[in-house]
């Protein structure tokens, strides 16, 4: 079976790393995978993103960077994300990864006009979430941990909103 590709575009705080591991560790633990089941790439360190067709799916983690910084690695990565979506490879974007994916697909990312959202928030799923392969079967409201200053303020053309909170209209979306 093909491995899962984890794209980690940033580092965690050192104080959290010693207690909970890195973002890639969180993804592996949450999905019940070992290191042999995954490959981790760090584009912010200059690592090239591989041919996504070699993997069964992609998870793009969070980062402390801001998507709107438009650093060269972010711009290259956005092209890679859009190509990967066009190739039909499933991608899950989490936090920064969600915003990066939204921007790569033609959406808009800005500082959240309602301010920074941090802590455990209630995310309300939309009716289309009931038929979503990832979210179907979950309760209509979920307590989720968040920490972000920026938001996908305009969904990519053709995207479907799957979840929102009081401060964030686009907590989750599906594209394609």
Where are these regions (language model features)?
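N-terminal beta1-alpha1 cap of cysteine-dependent amidohydrolase-like domains
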Residues: 1-87
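Short glycine-/acidic-enriched loop or helix-start segments at secondary-structure transitions
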Residues: 16-17, 69-70, 102-104, 156, ...
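Structured helix-beta-strand junction loops
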Residues: 34, 80, 87-88, 141, ...
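Cysteine-nucleophile active-site neighborhood
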Residues: 61-129
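Pocket-forming structural segment of enzyme catalytic cores
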Residues: 105-176
């Amino acid at each position: 079976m093909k491995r899962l590709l984890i794209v980690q575009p940033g580092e965690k705080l050192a104080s959290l790393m010693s207690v909970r591991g890195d973002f890639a560790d969180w993804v592996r633990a949450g999905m019940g995978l070992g290191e042999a089941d995954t490959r981790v790439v760090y584009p912010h360190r200059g690592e090239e993103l591989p041919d996504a067709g070699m993997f069964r799916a992609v998870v793009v983690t969070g980062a402390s960077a801001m998507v709107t910084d438009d650093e060269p690695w972010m711009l290259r990565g956005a092209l890679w994300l859009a190509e990967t979506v066009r190739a039909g490879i499933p991608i899950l974007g989490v936090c920064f990864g969600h915003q990066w994916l939204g921007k790569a697909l033609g959406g808009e990312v800005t500082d959240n006009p309602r301010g920074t959202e941090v802590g455990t928030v209630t995310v309300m799923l939309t009716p289309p979430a009931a038929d979503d392969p990832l979210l179907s079967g979950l309760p209509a409201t979920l307590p989720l941990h968040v920490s972000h200053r920026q938001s996908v303020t305009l969904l990519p053309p053709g995207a479907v909103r799957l979840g929102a909170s009081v401060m964030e209209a686009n907590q989750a979306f599906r594209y394609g």
